[in-house]
Amino acid sequence: MAGIVGYGAYIPKYRIKVEEIARVWNKDPESIKKGLLVYEKAVPSLDEDTATIAVEAARNALKRAEIDPKDIGAVYVGSESHPYAVKPTATIVAEAIDATPDLTAADLEFACKAGTAGIQMCMGLVESGLIKYGLAIGADTAQGAPGDALEYTAAAGGAAYIIGKSNVIAEFNGTYSYTTDTPDFWRREGKPYPRHGGRFTGEPAYFRHVINAAKGLMEKMGTKPEDYDYCVFHQPNGKFYIRVAKILGFKEEQYKIGLLTPYIGNTYSGAVPLGLSNVLDNCEGGERILAVSYGSGAGSDAFDITVTDRINKVKDKAPKTAYYLERKEYIDYAIYAKFRKKIKM
């Protein structure tokens, strides 16, 4: 089957702590941190958006893939925060990495799983022989209304994956999706901030879809949790991630490397791609990964992945995810509000 030829991450350097947001709204930061298992989040600068994040991640993926960008036959950017309502982010990325003009490109939307949907689309095109390589990116600059619970977690970041058949660093053994019409989270056209169903986003939405997708794939592959060295799940907060991992039977040593939300917040479409990139940074050949995304509305994509020995040849050819996790500068709420354009004149 098709596999990952190159991967790359990008996280903005600015951070705001839960304590700073809670101070402004006169909330108890300790109860928020305990309830969400989130301590700080990544904030995009004034000159950063989904397009710039996607370009940086794509360039890092190309460094590891060591391919001619002209051989990329498809570019898909999954996000719920594309900078233009009518103007594709994917064409900006394709032009920036010198992949144009002989390719197809499109923007994808499915809440937080649009990036993994792009990976599946690239897998199909590569497997069919229609393209040699495909580039799938999950990136977001998520927003939460001032004072809303989402403001403590809605963050920015993304990761890119080049899919192909030759010189793969990780092989896709299989994929499985679970999808229903579940309105747990939404944003109307023209509205700046999303609305959500509060606790309804848990059991009937996130947990139902992630668990069923994971179980469906393991049944399809004939595997059990102990057959995997690592697992990565969508992470709207740290609590949901750990709980779903334990429900499915995974242990801390399997899930901890993919858990990034406590330190950068929920990067939405970038969440599973970034968690997976950190796992790949720490993998060895022969190790196996289960990755399961989730997008409100609602659906989950699950992937069974086996890492090849080539991983050690490419890990250090681009900045690792840990570099972006450690590269940070703290800002206060005033700067955060300025960067995120929360002050309307």
UniProtKB/Swiss-Prot annotation:
GO biological process, one term: farnesyl diphosphate biosynthetic process, mevalonate pathway
Residues forming the catalytic site: E80 (proton donor/acceptor), C112 (acyl-thioester intermediate), H234 (proton donor/acceptor)
Residues where (3S)-3-hydroxy-3-methylglutaryl-CoA binds: D28, C112, T153, T201, H234, R243, N266, S296
Keywords on record: Acyltransferase, Isoprene biosynthesis, Transferase
Catalytic activity as recorded in UniProt: acetoacetyl-CoA + acetyl-CoA + H2O = (3S)-3-hydroxy-3-methylglutaryl-CoA + CoA + H(+)
Keyword Transferase included in the entry's annotation: yes
Pathway recorded for this protein: Metabolic intermediate biosynthesis; (R)-mevalonate biosynthesis; (R)-mevalonate from acetyl-CoA: step 2/3
E.C. number(s) listed in UniProt: 2.3.3.10
Highest taxon in the source lineage: Archaea
Stated role: Catalyzes the condensation of acetyl-CoA with acetoacetyl-CoA to form 3-hydroxy-3-methylglutaryl-CoA (HMG-CoA). Functions in the mevalonate (MVA) pathway leading to isopentenyl diphosphate (IPP), a key precursor for the biosynthesis of isoprenoid compounds that are building blocks of archaeal membrane lipids.
Complex formation: Interacts with acetoacetyl-CoA thiolase that catalyzes the precedent step in the pathway and with a DUF35 protein. The acetoacetyl-CoA thiolase/HMG-CoA synthase complex channels the intermediate via a fused CoA-binding site, which allows for efficient coupling of the endergonic thiolase reaction with the exergonic HMGCS reaction.
The name this protein goes by in its record: Hydroxymethylglutaryl-CoA synthase
